[in-house]
Regions:
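Hydrophobic helical h-region of N-terminal Sec-dependent signal peptides
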Residues: 6, 10-15
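C-terminal motif of bacterial Sec signal peptides marking the signal peptidase cleavage site
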Residues: 16-20
């Protein structure tokens, strides 16, 4: 069974209108030729093809949120329960590239990156993946963006002071405006301080910090928001150097308070476990904003809407052909 997608419907309609309104032979000939050219450009999607399933690695907070929300908790950390020959993406950007280049692929990405991804975002339980629908509670596939920070800076007192200032900056009107611009979902209540109103609490902000490097990392889904925030804050705090190395949510705690000790600020696209494996110190972590997760397919795919049950059946290997899920 094959579904045909008409990528240039408006153009075809315009040609038909032109042909009906202009009786000249030359115009009619041109219209017919153009119509034939449009027909040759029809994109065909074969639903009898096997679904190519993509996932993130077990270090990913997006994978954690995605699998948990669709009721497939056992797949958060265990690849053995997933469909055979599943492919793994190294990050949010890598997932986007894989789906863009695989006509029969399916995966999941951060809503904050959907608009510029070139992928098709699917409805979830009948609801479009939009910021408005996350805010009104109708779109259920979402999670928080969070941060955690180092608590022992040793002799790096300048870094520690900059990190403390950065955490306070996150609650300002300026920072929240930036997060919203980066598609983070949150409200500005009007009660937030401005940076100017709290800057005097952080003397480090008036110093020349151009030779001080602060290390940021963690979630690849939060990377865009994190980079925008540090780019904004650096000139407000002595032009410190922000070094970003994002390898997944699992590295956020490990890098700041765990065994790796290679980050000063870590970002997560899930909640901290707050167990023995992620025993973050009270007051050293918090929420940035909300972000949704979107199931995505290639633009030529005729699949438009999905459900938790359908996604789970694809990722578990119960359904392997596109015809199994496309009516």
């Amino acid at each position: 069974m094959k579904n045909k997608l008409f990528a240039m419907t408006i153009a075809v309609c315009s040609i038909m209108a032109l042909a009906s309104c202009d009786s000249s032979d030359s115009t009619s000939s041109n219209s017919v030729a153009e119509s034939e050219e449009m027909t040759s450009e029809l994109v065909e999607f074969d639903t009898d093809k096997t679904i190519k399933v993509y996932t993130r690695d077990t270090n990913s907070g997006t994978r954690d949120g995605f699998m948990s929300k669709i009721g497939f908790e056992e797949a958060v950390k265990d690849n053995s329960v997933l469909v055979d020959e599943i492919a793994e993406a190294t990050g949010n950007g890598d997932m986007i590239e894989k789906i863009k280049n695989d006509e029969y692929g399916i995966g999941y990405i951060s809503l904050s990156t959907l608009d510029d991804s070139g992928c098709k975002g699917l409805k979830y339980e009948g609801v479009d993946p939009t910021i408005a629908n996350v805010k009104n509670g109708s779109y259920g596939l979402y999670r928080n963006f969070n941060y955690c920070v180092r608590t022992d800076f040793g002799t790096n007192t300048s870094v520690g002071q900059i990190v403390n200032a950065f955490v306070s900056f996150l609650g300002t009107t300026e920072a929240k405006t930036t997060m919203i611009a980066e598609k983070g979902i949150l409200e500005i209540t009007g009660n937030e301080p401005t940076w100017a109103s709290i800057k005097d609490q952080f003397p480090i902000a008036t110093e020349d910090n151009s030779n001080v490097t602060v290390r940021f990392g963690g979630s690849t889904s939060v990377e865009g928001v994190a980079k925008a925030l540090t780019e904004q804050f650096s000139p407000l705090c002595g032009n410190f150097i922000a070094n970003h190395n994002h390898q997944g949510s699992g590295s956020a705690y490990k890098g700041t308070q765990g065994t790796a000790e290679d980050l000063d600020v870590g970002f997560l696209s899930r909640e901290l476990k707050l167990t023995s494996s992620e025993a973050a110190v009270s007051g050293s972590y918090g929420k940035l904003c909300i972000d949704a997760i979107v199931t995505v397919v290639n633009q030529v795919n005729s699949y438009e809407a999905t459900t938790a049950a359908a996604i789970k059946s694809i990722y578990s290997g119960e359904k392997t052909l596109w015809s199994d899920v496309i009516a």
